[in-house]
Amino acid sequence: MKVVVAQKDLKAALDIAQNTLGSSADISSHFVFDLQDNNQVTVMSSESKRLYSCVPVSPVKSTGVGKFTVEGKRLVQAVNAIGDGHTINMESDDKGNVALSREGNSKSKLNYPGLDPDTFPDWATEISSAKLSKALPAKLLTACLNAIKPYVSDDDTKRPELCQAVIRDGKMMATDAYSLAILRSNEFADLDFKIQLKDFPNVLKFLKAHETQDIEIHSTAKAHILKAQDGTTFGFMRSQHNFQNLPAHFLNSFDWTPRRVWAFNKGDLLNSIELLSSGSDKNDFFVTFNHPEDALTNPTLTMDSLTERDSLVEEVPLMVVNPADATQYPLKMVIDRQNAEVSGVDTGSFKFNYKYLKEVLSGLDNNVVFGCSKEGSKGFMLFKNRFDDHDIDMVSIVAWVS
């Protein structure tokens, strides 16, 4: 079997396929080349049977039908070293060994021992049984995954069911038990989707490589198969843990008007937290926010001092919101509060864990707006956002510290 391909075209395929390449001394560390009739060649890789990719190599000339393998790390290194503007020949003998050469230079030949391609994980069966669930723009999926990622738990020992984001009932959601986020879009209707935190980087790389395309989502009970319009296929296993049911009132919090609402410049808020934390115990993450309803001054943030002799206090300037600039969330939260009737107990003083707040802020622009409400003895900070480019509404919630 023989493959003749331009260096840039082989490199483009390997750049995607190497995202699911393993490092063990077995087939998981090899690329598998599949040659079919009519110059149809794909390159596959699968890490620990959990991740899979299949990428067309095109344009290409091929001879023979069958499969051969090449150690992935060495092949990528060789292709990068050969550089653009050259043509690469790969030829497999009847023992599976592969010779790589640069066309026009007969002395430049590299030999690689191959493995049995039949030991490659059986993703073909999973793919053939998968049913098409939905086709979504890659940019929409990318925006949603980047927005939800800070809320996915990374503690897979105590709460593995929370180490994933899911789409169900028209909403994407995630929680680490202390904060949560929900994204709502008509595009999510009738879609059942689960992605584990450890798969976010590879899925996002796949989406980035196909950012102008629509992505088909095919599903089985065990896996999701993403198919791009150029024929590239990416597979990953679904978590077998059931995501917990979120309280119904949180799922319907998009229309809430919190009891109190504040707007800040993101830099001002983060700088205040950084300053306070520099003078507190390294294991202390609790900040007290204080701004009574009748206050004529800016809100204050307070932390216990490292010396425990006094408290550290920092004032955070409020941002002035012009109604003409607040027609969309998050700034619209301020106007909604001003136009709504005030009722209930004031929520102007509470304690929060700044680690969770900083995770939320990592996904926001320079305008930070949040409201607070209280239910019995429990309170929470509520954030709203809107992705107009994709018609997506988002709410996120950070629990107060009791």
Locations of the language-model features?
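Structural preference for solvent-exposed beta-strand-turn elements
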Residues: M1-S402
